[in-house]
Amino acid sequence: MSLETVPKDLRHLRACLLCSLVKTIDQFEYDGCDNCESYLQMKGNREMVYECTSSSFDGVIAMMSPEDSWVAKWQRIGNFKPGVYAVTVTGRLPPGVVRELKSRGVIYRSRDTAVKT
């Protein structure tokens, strides 16, 4: 797991609404999302960071070997990069972002357990 992926602080943590990666707001703005940057383009765009991440999430998983992890398969994060992931994330991506994902062939499954998709 790359040290750039690990949250540098326990304050101001946010989770990506698409893949549930957990980082600080500054890390998302500086590096974007390690898994979703090509779709969400958060790097250098604080407004997109606020729209595409949530500060409300439950549980964290530190995933180091996605190919060997049954937890990664259970959480549907087995194809993602090693890092710290939220178990559930409250919130949904904006409709415009969901439409853009769909047009690029990406299926969006909300990680919000309060909302059925």
From Swiss-Prot:
Subunit structure, as described in the record: Interacts with SUPT5H to form the DSIF complex. DSIF interacts with RNA polymerase II and with the positive transcription elongation factor b complex (P-TEFb complex), which is composed of CDK9 and cyclin-T.
Similarity-based family: Belongs to the SPT4 family.
Pfam families in UniProt: Spt4 (PF06093)
SMART domains for this protein: Spt4
PANTHER family registered for this protein in UniProt: SUPPRESSOR OF TY 4 (PTHR12882), TRANSCRIPTION ELONGATION FACTOR SPT4 (PTHR12882:SF1)
Molecular function in Gene Ontology: RNA polymerase II complex binding; zinc ion binding
Function: May function as a component of the DRB sensitivity-inducing factor complex (DSIF complex), which regulates transcription elongation by RNA polymerase II. Probably enhances transcriptional pausing at sites proximal to the promoter, which may facilitate the assembly of an elongation competent RNA polymerase II complex. Also acts to stimulate transcriptional elongation at low nucleotide concentrations. Regulation of transcriptional elongation by this protein is required for the expression of genes which control neuronal development.
Organism: Danio rerio
InterPro entries: RPABC4/Spt4 (IPR029040), Spt4 (IPR009287), Spt4/RpoE2_Znf (IPR022800), Spt4_sf (IPR038510)
Protein name: Transcription elongation factor SPT4
Gene: supt4h1
Lineage: Eukaryota, Metazoa, Chordata, Craniata, Vertebrata
